Amino acid sequence: MYRVGLAALLLGLGALPLSAQTIDLSRYEMVDLTHALNARTVFWPTSEGGFELQRLAYGPTPGGYFYAANAFAMPEHGGTHLDAPIHFAEGGVTADRIPLDRLVLPAVVIDVSAQAAKDPDYRLTADDVQTFERGHGRIPAGAAVLLRTGWDERWPDRKAYLGDDTPRDASRLHFPSFGPDVARLLVEERRVGALGVDVASIDYGQSKDFMVHRIAGAHGVPGFENLTGLGALPPTGSLLLALPIKIEGGSGGPLRAVALVPRR
């Protein structure tokens, strides 16, 4: 398995030398790739419920100090979130057991927003990957391949984002994503560490067999879905930190995704 520490990753990006074991983060722009969770958060159409925030306390206390606290509830798979390998792979790794080098890893961004604008069912192809590699070099093992479709600009309009807003019906969805053939190329040949996308699924909207999920899950590759802001990242050279809530036995969960982009 591809394993490398955070310091080594930053060294590869040119962030070091280290001084007294510190990292000069001023050399990086931090880009938030996460949608905020709220009542308008988009969930898969067949999900039970959405995001709920219950205020437990807000205001002055008898002791004279201010205090605020909330409780929240939500399905695992909504908003910017993790798909753990077990989501579509029996016996696969659960959310709490994903190795950190699958969550903190170099990012490669492939932009298909032009193609997706013409075809909402567009799927990344092997030709797209080969074109990318001719311009930017071979996708390295252990990298996160992030697919930019531009669909995040439609958030949180459910009909525009998912292609349909019929309650409890996932059969009419239309949005771009990865395709099975390119998933095999990336997972089996390039040996990438993760797949991410700025739409609701690493499978395209009209998928009926969720083959990309199945291929990724079988190889222990997590998925990061409903990302945003990928247009602010260069094709190569940034570092992705995609850290989910550590739910024991979870098939996924809310994700805070951030990229460190070297300042020019």
List the predicted regions and their residue ranges.
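Active-/binding-site microenvironments in catalytic and ligand-binding cores
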Residues: A20-R264
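N-terminal secretory signal peptides that target proteins for export/translocation
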Residues: M1-Y2
